[in-house]
Amino acid sequence: MDQIIISKAEEIISKKRQNCVLALIDLDGYPTASTITVSKADGIKWLTFCTGINKPKRINLNNRASVCFISENPLYNISLVGKIEVITDLEIKKEMWYDGLENHFQSPEDPNYYVLKFTTERYNLFVDFQELKGKF
C-alpha cells in the first residue's frame, strides 16, 4: 500500500510544468512561501526549479526548504521537507531550460537565471484519502 501512495504522488509531481509552493527562510530569518514550477523531478526524491536571483541569496544563507503540491480536485496534499541547492553548471542550466522561460530570462547563459535542486529528506503524502509519512 505504501508504494502505491508513493507512486501516485510521483505521478502527480511528474506532470509537465507542475506548480507547487516552495517555502524558504528569508534574509531576516522568517519563512516565506511562493509558487514555482517544477522543471524536472525524480519521483519524490528530488526536484529542480528555474528561478531568478532572489531565491539563491536566501538558499545560500539557509538551505532548509519545504515543497507542497496541493489540489482540491482530485484531492491531494504532497508535502516534502529537505535541503535545496543552487546549481550554476551551464550544461545543467541548458538542460533545465523550457519554453516560457524566455519571458523572464534572455537565455540559459543569463546571469540572473538559476537552477535550484531540492532533495527530499522526509515526506507527508495525502493521496486518495490515504496518508503516508516517511524519511529517506
What are these regions (language model features)?
Residues 1-17:
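Short, basic/aromatic recognition patches
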Residues 12-27, 65-69:
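A short, Trp-centered hydrophobic/proline-enriched beta-strand micro-motif
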Residues 16-19, 31-34, 78, 109-112:
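Short, basic and Ser/Thr-rich N-terminal targeting/leader segments
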Residues 19-46:
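N-terminal leader/targeting helix
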Residues 25-27, 37, 52-54, 70-72, ...:
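Histidine- and/or cysteine-centered catalytic micro-motif in compact active-site loops
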Residues 30-33, 57-59, 76-78, 125-126:
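Short acidic/glycine-rich loop or secondary-structure boundary segments that cap or lie
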Residues 39-75:
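A short mixed-secondary-structure module that forms the rim of ligand-binding clefts
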Residues 79-136:
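Charged, gly/pro-rich active-site loop segments
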